[in-house]
């Protein structure tokens, strides 16, 4: 799992950049959803003329298709945990170019907040979620292992600043699990001159190569990966010796900087996770390539 947070002011093209980065995923999700809608209509048609008893038998022998969506802009932990526990999803993403929608949403307010933060932390660390129901509703209880969740939130400085000052979001380790980026604001330089007008993202060879790779990885056809160990259906990519040495030096550098009077003395929750986050990001890049 990766939790990503990006700062960008209103008008900084947050939506444009995210749509460009997620283009292949969005198109894939749309195709899958159209197939799901057709399957659902067929399923409904199959039981439309049946009586109640036959309809129950039909539903038992032909369960309805599941919504294949994995991208969400606003979903509660309770809902996403249910999708994991029920085996509908193994991977999901909460992505929004309005981070205020998440930080100001139902999950982050009221009595459920601390429980949700703990759940997100557990999901990040162990890929584990648990749902417990009352004895009268045991069918709703269950666990899911080795699941993944990606946060990809973008928001204005004012929104992220308030979140980063929140002692609960910091103290419970929720925000320290995020990778924060603050890209340069290009406002004032984005002139639509002749050079700009001659460019087309859809014909840029770099973007085409990126989208093509995304499409390949999204393809459901199995790809042999015999050189990597499988762990519950997920590939484990080991670090070579050079990577281990780089990781060790990186870890020790950040550990020393957490000492008294050092740069990260008061940011230990963030600094202590730097090495882990770097390993996760490197693994995603290695797998993508």
Residue locations for each model-derived region?
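Phosphate-sensing "switch" segment of ASCE/P-loop ATPases
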Residues: 31-33, 38-41, 45-48, 122, ...
